[in-house]
């Protein structure tokens, strides 16, 4: 062997390099090649040679690609492939037998070549022939391999065409799939099939649900078809939606008492006044009554004890068409003669006595009315109603009744020769002066009745609200007068009610208040300040403003009064700019006040009088004020209560 190595090293065409050693394992009888450069172990020679050529070419300096080991690599690869093909296609015995025979023949040929190559000594001519033999064997092996692959593919193709074999690689056709690759491919294929089945099932369910929604219910076999022919209206019986006529009552049923009649009583008496004139007086109560016409005011109503019977004759012809009105039609009314009253109720009256007593009564009435209707200093005097003095020729007796001492007003019918108009006598008792206010309350109503003027119904709630609003206006006007700004509530107050000296004093107070109010810009400019001030800070500023105003102007105003003044000034200033476009059209007093408050912005805020809350919107402010309205307030400690029970309990516990 040493001679052979010396021959190879001595020749110029062969250069040898020691790249590794052979390592033997005694436990499992395995041989491995040890690399000197990277100290790795390789179990096969082709792998070791490929490792040297790829990783250590810079040290070994390979000049060309060596194919000495290519045949051995192919043979070793063919053996591995034969084992894999035998395992994958074990069901086909014929293909396995043929492949094993071919592999055995190739192995024999290779063994023979290896034995020949191992003989000693080897000449160059023999080496060249051996290379040619190796090339021929390699070519034949490649051809056999391709033929075997084509034959195996033809045999394994299924007839149905659904089965798909292993995918071929375009770059390396010689390498086939391993067992692990085949298993993963099979698993992936089966999973795809299962997922496709699940997908198809889901799609079928969705289609079924959609079709069930859109599908209409089939018609029943016994169902009737809709009518397509026009309806014959002549065959349909007519329907009457009117109420059937009520039976006409008999004459005995129509005999009723006068006290039980309501509206029919007025209609009957109206018809009776056109024929006969009454002679019995009528009692007038101080309670407001319903609206009376000029003809109804002349009707003489007796006491509730008088009975009147109305005989109503049936109509000659009844109307066949029914209506919603009263079923009985009144054609004729007969009134019985009135009862004769005793002579003590009716006393003779002289014209002169009537005129004297009438003058005295009117004087007392005027005096009582003057005491009640004193005009306020800061409001216009209300206009009085005009009173007509002309009397009608058909006037009758009127009785004004009070609780303890009635005042009787009797009418006396005179001839046209003695007097042109009828006069009224008022008989006063000794204690009638105490009831002058009650008589005064009904004076305007009595005058309207005498002059045929319709009375309007009076709502006590409306009167109460008007009285409360009037008192609130008076209170706000008195507060504004303390700071010299009463013209904010009414522009005509200063021009009509105040004297020139008082007007000058009011303007000085207004200027003084304006100078003080101008310092507190955080109050009147609340909406322009950013960030807005907190309610606690604003309440402190209002308290300081109240203290300064009381000290400077010598008045005693509370924080709630100052807040009310601020709100009224802001609202008035806003209304001036929104209601009047041309400032020349407003009055002189309003123009002066507007000039004094020229520093105020148009936007403002509402300050609650009862708490420290501040509001920008008027609706929210009014809604908040309702929460402060209470019905019960203690006069001693000024506490408010929502319910009467709480108020009484407070009085028992806190103020025994």
Swiss-Prot record:
Its main location: nucleus. Residues 89-104 have a biased composition (Polar residues). Residues 80-131 are annotated as: Disordered. GO terms for cellular component: autosome; nucleus. A zinc finger (C2H2-type) spans 33-56, 606-628, 632-655. Coiled coil: none annotated. PROSITE patterns: ZINC_FINGER_C2H2_1, ZINC_FINGER_C2H2_2. The keyword Cell cycle applies. It is found in: Nucleus; Chromosome. GO terms for biological process: male meiosis chromosome separation; male meiosis I. Keywords: Cell cycle, Chromosome, Chromosome partition, Meiosis, Metal-binding, Nucleus, Repeat, Zinc, Zinc-finger. One of its GO terms (molecular function) is zinc ion binding. InterPro entries: Znf_C2H2_type. Belongs to the Teflon family. Specifically required in males for proper segregation of autosomal bivalents at meiosis I. Expression is required in the male germ line prior to spermatocyte stage S4. May have a role as a bridging molecule maintaining adhesion to hold autosome bivalents together via heterochromatic connections. Drosophilid specific gene duplication generates rgr and tef. Teflon has a function unique to Drosophilids. This is Protein teflon. It comes from Drosophila sechellia. The gene is tef.
């Amino acid at each position: 062997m040493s001679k052979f190595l010396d021959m190879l090293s001595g020749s110029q065409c062969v250069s040898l390099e020691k790249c590794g050693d052979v390592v033997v394992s005694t436990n499992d009888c395995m041989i491995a090649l040890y690399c000197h450069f990277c100290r790795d172990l390789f179990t096969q020679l082709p792998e070791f040679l490929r490792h040297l050529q790829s990783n250590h070419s810079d040290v070994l300096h390979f000049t060309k690609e060596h194919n000495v080991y290519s045949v051995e690599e192919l043979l070793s690869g063919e053996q591995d492939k034969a084992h894999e093909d035998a395992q994958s296609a074990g069901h086909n015995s014929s293909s396995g037998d043929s492949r094993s025979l071919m592999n055995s023949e190739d192995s024999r040929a290779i063994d023979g070549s290896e034995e020949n190559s191992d003989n000693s000594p080897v000449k160059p001519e023999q080496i060249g022939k051996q290379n040619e033999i190796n090339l021929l064997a390699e070519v034949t092996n490649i051809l056999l391999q391709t033929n075997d692959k084509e034959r195996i593919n033809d045999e394994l193709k299924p007839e149905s065409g659904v089965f798909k074999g292993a995918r071929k690689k375009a770059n390396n056709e010689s390498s086939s799939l391993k067992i692990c690759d085949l298993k993963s491919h099979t698993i992936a294929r089966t999973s795809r099939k299962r997922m496709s089945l699940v997908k198809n099932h889901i799609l079928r369910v969705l289609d079924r649900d959609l079709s069930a929604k859109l599908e209409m219910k089939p018609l029943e076999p016994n169902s009737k078809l809709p009518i397509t022919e026009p309806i014959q209206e002549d065959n349909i019986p007519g329907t009457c939606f009117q109420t059937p006529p009520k039976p006409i009552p008999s004459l005995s049923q129509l005999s009723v008492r006068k006290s039980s009649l309501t509206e029919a009583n007025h209609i009957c008496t109206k018809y009776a006044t056109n024929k006969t004139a009454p002679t019995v007086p009528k009692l007038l109560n101080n309670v407001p009554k319903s609206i009376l016409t000029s003809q109804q005011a002349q009707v003489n109503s007796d006491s509730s004890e008088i009975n009147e019977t109305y005989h109503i004759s049936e109509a000659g012809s009844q109307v066949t068409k029914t209506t919603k009105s009263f079923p009985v039609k009144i054609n004729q009314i007969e009134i019985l003669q009135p009862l004769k009253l005793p002579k003590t109720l009716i006393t003779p009256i002289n014209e002169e006595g009537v005129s004297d007593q009438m003058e005295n009564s009117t004087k007392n009435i005027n005096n009582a009315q003057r005491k009640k209707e004193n005009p306020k200093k800061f409001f216009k005097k209300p206009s009085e109603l005009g009173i007509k003095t002309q009397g009608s020729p058909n006037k009758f007796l009127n009785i004004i009744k009070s609780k303890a001492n009635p005042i009787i007003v009797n009418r006396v019918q005179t001839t046209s020769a003695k007097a042109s108009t009828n006069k009224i006598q008022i008989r006063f008792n000794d204690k009638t002066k105490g009831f002058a206010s009650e008589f005064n309350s009904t004076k305007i109503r009595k005058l309207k009745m005498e002059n045929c003027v319709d009375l309007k119904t009076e709502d006590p709630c409306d009167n109460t609200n008007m009285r409360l609003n009037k008192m609130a206006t008076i209170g706000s006007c008195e507060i504004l007068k303390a700071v010299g700004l009463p013209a904010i509530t009414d522009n005509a107050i200063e021009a009509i009610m105040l004297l020139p000296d008082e007007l000058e004093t009011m303007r000085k107070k207004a200027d003084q208040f304006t100078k003080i109010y101008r310092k507190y810009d955080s109050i009147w400019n609340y909406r322009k300040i950013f960030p807005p001030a907190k309610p606690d800070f604003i309440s402190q500023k209002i308290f300081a403003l109240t203290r300064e105003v009381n000290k400077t102007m010598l008045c005693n105003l509370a924080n709630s009064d100052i807040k009310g003044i601020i709100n009224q000034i802001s609202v008035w200033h806003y209304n001036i700019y929104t209601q009047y476009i041309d400032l020349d059209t407003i009055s002189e007093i309003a123009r002066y006040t507007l000039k004094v408050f020229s520093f105020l912005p148009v936007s403002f805020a509402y300050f609650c009088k009862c708490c420290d809350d501040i509001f920008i919107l008027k609706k929210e402010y009014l809604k908040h004020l309702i929460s402060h309205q209470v019905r019960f307030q203690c006069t001693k400690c000024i506490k408010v209560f929502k319910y009467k029970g709480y108020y009484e309990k407070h009085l028992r516990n806190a103020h025994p």
